[in-house]
């Protein structure tokens, strides 16, 4: 028992030092922040899987206290909110061996709740208004587009028409941030668990089985979510409310990505059953992404008609 506790203390101390280094580098070099968002959760997952979630919590608390002396207490708290808290939830689910959907969705929701709190704290105590910064960048991008059109010698009517389209596109991009963030963080959680599995296998521990591309299965309501998003986007043309546009855009985004994942899984399954090599399958899958809507239709048919099993039955009969 003492040997186990000693090993846990030593590993926690070493991994806590790594967490502090990753976080300090990410706060000093902004473009490395994505790498920090990947490495810190992996460290906490491995620690939780080997010794329990309480050691991961201890590592986060220790790192936050020490980092408060190097940067500031508030910035240390913001790092815990943005990276530490979602990573701890993911580590807890990894240790408890949650099913894949629960393991990906719950930490993502925690991040989406923690991020507005982080924005509010940044605005209140650091005078960092991310909304104003976004609006300024939005206005600057629109101005640059207009200057580009004028330099090309376009007529005023053409410029105004194109600027209207550009403003609508930028506004739609603003609406889709929530849905795109959800998908992006969920995919990041999958990658984190995949890396943690590799480390656990090398360390002789027990990994958490994750479904590969062949086993990806989206819920059937993905089709209805996508169709509802399409219908609501049509209603936005009749009733131009911002809240309706926000809901329609994010329903459409979430449904689209879920159907895209289902379609990729179905295509990979079809190529696998026909004996294509992994290299050729990856090349064909990459080319299929150039026709995203076609892949989404394949995913929709797979959910509604069980396309992959129909093709598997035909191939076995052949």
Predicted feature locations:
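Small-residue-rich helix-loop
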Residues: 203-258, 262
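Central hydrophobic cores of alpha-helical transmembrane segments
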Residues: 58-65, 104-111, 277-287
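Membrane-interface interhelical loops and short interface/amphipathic helices
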Residues: 121-173
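Hydrophobic, aromatic-enriched interface-forming segments
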Residues: 151-209
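Short helix-perturbing small/polar motifs within transmembrane alpha-helices
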Residues: 10-15, 80-126
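Alpha-helical membrane segments and adjacent membrane-interface helices in multi-pass membrane proteins
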Residues: 33-92, 302-305
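Long, positively charged, glycine-interspersed low-complexity recognition regions
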Residues: 1, 5, 13-16, 241-318
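Hydrophobic transmembrane alpha-helices
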Residues: 1-62, 272-282
